[in-house]
């Protein structure tokens, strides 16, 4: 049986390619971002928890394929109680309406 090989690209040393979405502090960890690239290939959304897995979820938007990011966007009040790492998905329903879903 052949093992599946998934190609990887390591850009960890190419710091000129790194983009800061949100700067944490020594007391506030901000990690586990999930991004979604929209079909126009320039609009992106990013969701991430405050702290290590919550509480609360932050949503930001980029209009230039992730080079720059908006300030945190308004989110529903119940996102303040999220206690996990969120993920964001795009679905187009049978009614052809595009919807974004955030799960945590």
Where are these regions (language model features)?
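Asp-box/BNR beta-propeller blade signature and adjacent active/binding-site loops
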Residues: 1-104
């Amino acid at each position: 049986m052949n093992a599946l090989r998934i190609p990887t690209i390591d850009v960890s040393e190419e710091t000129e390619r790194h983009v800061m979405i949100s700067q944490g502090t020594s007391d506030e960890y901000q990690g586990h971002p999930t991004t979604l690239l929209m079909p126009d290939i320039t609009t992106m959304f990013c969701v991430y928890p405050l702290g290590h897995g919550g509480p609360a979820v932050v949503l930001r938007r980029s209009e230039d394929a992730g080079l720059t990011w908006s300030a945190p966007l308004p989110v529903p009040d119940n996102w303040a109680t999220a206690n996990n790492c969120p993920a964001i998905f795009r679905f187009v329903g049978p009614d052809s309406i595009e919807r974004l879903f955030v799960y945590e």
